[in-house]
Amino acid sequence: MDIAPEREDSVDMPARRRWFEDRRVLKRIVLAVLIVLILPYALIVFYLLPFIHPVSTLMLRDLVLLRGYDRQWVSLDNIAPVVVQSVMMSEDGQYCFHGGVDWAEMRMLVEDTLKGQATRGGSTIPMQTAKNLFLWNGRSFVRKALELPLAVTTDFVLSKRRLMEIYLNIAEWGPGIYGIEAAARHHFKVPASKLTRRQASLLAVSLPNPIDRNAGKPGRGLRRLAGVIERRAQGSGDYIKCIYD
């Protein structure tokens, strides 16, 4: 009479063992996902330290693929103010006034998307910085959902000066060219501190597509766009007070 229960227990043991093993694997997966999601927020706090020079995911990719890259970190004090003016007027005119996300612009972007219309970029400098530091290129709702809270946190934790300094030192300005110092030397053979207003505007308008837009050898369309940004930058005094006041 006792044989059947013993056989049943012996049959159940492998199933129980597999269940516990599967549960351990699931726990490890959940833990790994949580670490991946939380780590960027810890790094943002770490980047408060002025002597820390962050690298972007694209720079890490180039290292993994053994391509190498050129990036020479410079402080904001060693970057010509015309660069900041031009980049802000080209990429994020409301940089000093929003909290990481320009919600009015984002709302219009969503409305255009729902209507099936061609959309503008809509990414602020904090959003671009968060993407460059922690995420991947390419448009997707998943990336945008991860990018928004990272941008808000980045803008909240870091000062506007520190955030701009990081952005200008990790932005891509050509294949394997990262940061404003490497870009200035590569395209114009001068340090970032010596860039002219025209050169700064050319670098600024190449940011959305640095592989195809060559600031050092601009086409007619790029020169025309740079002229627009150059004029805006000349009247940008009220827009850059969070950086230089």
UniProtKB/Swiss-Prot annotation:
GO terms for cellular component: peptidoglycan-based cell wall; plasma membrane. SUPFAM superfamilies: Lysozyme-like. It is a single-pass membrane protein. Keywords: Cell inner membrane, Cell membrane, Cell shape, Cell wall biogenesis/degradation, Glycosyltransferase, Membrane, Peptidoglycan synthesis, Transferase, Transmembrane, Transmembrane helix. GO terms for molecular function: pentosyltransferase activity; peptidoglycan glycosyltransferase activity. InterPro entries: Glyco_trans_51, Lysozyme-like_dom_sf, PBP_transglycosylase, Pep_trsgly. The chain crosses the membrane at residues 29-49. Gene3D superfamilies: Biosynthetic peptidoglycan transglycosylase-like. It is an enzyme of class 2 (transferase). Pathway: Cell wall biogenesis; peptidoglycan biosynthesis. Belongs to the glycosyltransferase 51 family. Peptidoglycan polymerase that catalyzes glycan chain elongation from lipid-linked precursors. PANTHER family: BIOSYNTHETIC PEPTIDOGLYCAN TRANSGLYCOSYLASE, MONOFUNCTIONAL BIOSYNTHETIC PEPTIDOGLYCAN TRANSGLYCOSYLASE. This is Biosynthetic peptidoglycan transglycosylase. The gene is mtgA.
